């Protein structure tokens, strides 16, 4: 990040900008990092409707409308107000948790699809998307924070990784069966990340990649059909990185995987 290079911590410039970015504290109490997956699920729902209308739908600026704008604002607000239990740092520990997660993602997707135009075909096309996003949530539910000195073992997470790989494979297969190039390709490209974490010698960096790309890959592919979506994601990403750097000294969110610690076998 250029700010880290040219405005290192401890300099006067860093201190001045720290004061400036503290003005965004109230915005970040809304947990805007959660907006990335929430918006992605929402736009994925709209993608299904657009795909059913036009299989070759691509790079269409006119896909943005007041209905989507309303939902892009409303859903993060409601999510924050409800203090959803599906925090990506928490554990999903029961079948009930998984079912609630599926219902939660399904509702957001169907809202994105526009409830007034929902059909059986829409529901069928939604299934692989929900399966993929469930795989993403399961990946994020694996706690990789070792700052408190606690260790975790690969034997404690390999079952989850198997489920993640299986869900991604199923999502890709169902997408291919539906002739939906979006989810079939997204899931297929994502599969190697949890597969590496499952098969190769255990390392935190494999899980970090699996987490990041569970959101990044679908978001970027959706941006190819909804170009305006890209211009929502980039400013939020840049603002978040600079906010956390100038208020806490950490560069986050990031795709950099520099954690050297290995996971015990």
Where are these regions (language model features)?
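N-terminal topogenic module of multi-pass integral membrane proteins
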Residues: 1-128
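Membrane-helix boundary elements
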Residues: 39-50, 140-179
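Hydrophobic, membrane-inserted alpha-helices
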Residues: 42-44, 104-110, 165-173, 191-198, ...
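Membrane-helix interface and helix-disruption motif detector
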Residues: 45-67, 111-130, 170-191, 203-208, ...
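Generic alpha-helical transmembrane segments
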Residues: 65-76, 128-139, 161-171, 185-199
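Cytoplasmic membrane-interface regions of multi-pass membrane proteins
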Residues: 75-96, 138-158, 198-214, 248-257
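Transmembrane alpha-helical segments of multi-pass membrane proteins
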Residues: 91-107, 129-134, 154-169, 216-222
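C-terminal transmembrane-bundle signature of multipass membrane proteins
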Residues: 187-265
């Amino acid at each position: 990040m250029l700010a880290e290079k040219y405005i290192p911590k401890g300099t006067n410039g860093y201190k001045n900008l720290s004061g400036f970015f503290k003005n965004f504290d109230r915005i970040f109490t809304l947990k805007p990092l959660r907006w990335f997956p929430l918006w992605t699920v929402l736009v994925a729902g709209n993608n299904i409707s657009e795909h059913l209308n036009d299989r070759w739908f691509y790079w269409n600026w006119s896909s943005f409308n007041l209905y989507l704008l309303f939902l892009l604002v409303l859903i993060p607000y409601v999510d924050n107000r409800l203090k959803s239990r599906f925090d990506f740092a928490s554990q999903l520990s029961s079948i009930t948790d998984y079912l609630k997660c599926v219902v939660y993602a399904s509702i957001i997707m169907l809202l994105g699809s526009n409830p007034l135009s929902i059909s059986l075909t829409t529901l069928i096309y939604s299934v692989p998307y929900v399966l993929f996003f469930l795989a993403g949530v399961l990946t994020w539910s694996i706690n990789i924070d070792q700052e408190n000195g606690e260790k975790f073992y690969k034997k404690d997470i390999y079952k989850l990784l198997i489920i993640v790989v299986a869900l991604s494979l199923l999502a890709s297969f169902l997408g291919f069966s539906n002739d939906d190039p979006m989810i079939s390709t997204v899931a297929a490209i994502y599969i190697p990340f949890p597969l590496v974490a499952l098969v190769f010698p255990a390392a935190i960096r494999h899980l970090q990649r699996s987490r990041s790309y569970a959101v990044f890959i679908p978001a970027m592919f959706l941006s190819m059909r909804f170009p305006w979506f890209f211009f929502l994601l980039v400013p939020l990403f840049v603002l978040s990185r600079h906010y956390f750097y100038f208020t806490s000294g950490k560069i986050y969110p990031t795709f950099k995987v520099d954690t050297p610690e290995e996971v015990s076998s």
